[in-house]
Amino acid sequence: MLIKKVELVKTAFKPGDYPEPVKREVAFAGRSNVGKSTLLNTLFQRKLAHTSSKPGKTRSINFYLVNSKYYFVDLPGYGFASASKQELARWKELIEDYFSTRDNLNLVTILMDSRHPMQKNDYKMLEWIKDYSIPFIVVLTKTDKLSGNELKKMIQIYEKELKLWGSPPIIPFSAKTRRGLNELLKILIP
């Protein structure tokens, strides 16, 4: 399935400021600078989500209408160390409200950097998703920066860690080489 049409339809800075929950939603979550916006732009086949080399650029929840059928939802990155405690609390409130109020949220796509093991904030995100009983998949980003053996080793580490959360699908992805793109699209747009 291809993404033929996409548009940013809503940017939410506060809880409840979302579009009507009438379309299937897929949320994208991950640490700051893990490549959420880059992944979305690769899926969209154009630069619609703003990318930056500075972590913490996405500070709102952005709703993209895809093929007039689905919302792809870009969540703020978590774990950005230089954000103020007040801003971190606001982001936490925004994401918790989103998870707890969106009955049409069918899947969370958690992005993790393939070069590093899971971090404390990744575990917190997994606990949130578990608490809300939301299905999820894991996308390992930046796989082009690892050798084949290094990637294989990291996938094994992630598989072992994720057994505690029901062994979700793990998709190795690279925006540069487009590795994993077709596999991901099959899951996101059934």
From Swiss-Prot:
GO terms for cellular component: cytosol. GTP binds at residues 30-37, 56-60, 74-77, 141-144, 173-175. InterPro entries: G_ENGB_dom (IPR030393), GTP-bd (IPR006073), GTP-bd_ribosome_bio_YsxC (IPR019987), P-loop_NTPase (IPR027417), Small_GTP-bd (IPR005225). Residues 22-190 form the EngB-type G domain. GO terms for molecular function: GTP binding; metal ion binding. Keywords: Cell cycle, Cell division, GTP-binding, Magnesium, Metal-binding, Nucleotide-binding, Septation. Mg(2+) binds at S37, T58. One of its GO terms (biological process) is division septum assembly. Its cofactor is Mg(2+). Belongs to the TRAFAC class TrmE-Era-EngA-EngB-Septin-like GTPase superfamily. EngB GTPase family. Necessary for normal cell division and for the maintenance of normal septation. This is Probable GTP-binding protein EngB. It comes from Kosmotoga olearia (strain ATCC BAA-1733 / DSM 21960 / TBF 19.5.1). The lineage of its organism: Bacteria, Thermotogati, Thermotogota, Thermotogae, Kosmotogales. The gene is engB.
